[in-house]
Amino acid sequence: MKIAIEAQRIFRKEKHGMDYVALETIREIQKIDRQNEYFILVSPGEDRCLQESDNMHIVQIDYPSYPLWEQIGLPSTLKKIQPDLLHCTGNTAPLWCHTPLILTLHDIIFLEPKQGKNQSVYQKLGRCYRRFVVPRILNKCRKIITVSNFEREHICKFLHWEPKKITTVYNGYSSHFRPITEYQAVTQKYIGTEHYFFFLGNTDPKKNTARILQAYRHYLNTSSQPLPLLIADLKEEVINNYLRTYGLTDIKSMLYYPGYIPNKDLPALYSGATAFIYTSLRESFGIPILEAMACGTPVKIGRASCRERV
């Protein structure tokens, strides 16, 4: 059987949740399946994190944007490969494609009312693209996979779908997430103190960054020995904008914001943290919760969404 797997962004240097889910899924398939033939469809990128094997081939498709890659480049490549099955791993798929389709629909947050207005232009365009594509491809799917029963129930209720049409395949965490005892060499690259709180930030309103910063100022004002806050994935100009907008410039000296942190450094940063904070307003799963727990780190979560079940 010839199986094509869409994994467009796994070679990009700054990968995030869905990219890692696709990458780790492919790596595990590579270990256990020697019978079927796989074609991994990717964009060119700096991080060549996957190697070919006898029955697994990497096919690079070079288009300047995600929609063009998915709606023109991907169908064109499928015509050449002629696979028996296509698995699209990141919520969307080609609108015009005759290959039997399996879709991983991580969430339908993009179909729900927005929770704020501070999204980037890139996020807004991505939301519009998903809102257009997803309703038009769902009925074409042979099977839909989602990542938690919480999200499965939500999809069925929101889209009026029968539960039998959707299969839950839970996310997990990579084996390199484990307690690290000698973490100082890594943590010193990002924060110059031994004790700290760790937060994964984002400009998406659902990540709740503004309220975290407001709550952190309250903590600073009420604690006799406050700990600094390490914020991943937010650049200085974004932090400065939050602080100005919400009148929080007085807390800047207690914040560390190195920007994107490579996945290989996260186990040490989780292990060194006094606690990991994950209080986003809406998630379908929440992989960082498992990663932090696997490293032995206490986790502070909000009650919204799927996190209590996780």
Question: Each predicted region: which residue ranges?
Answer:
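Carbohydrate transferase catalytic cores enriched for Leloir-type hexosyltransferases
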Residues: 1-308
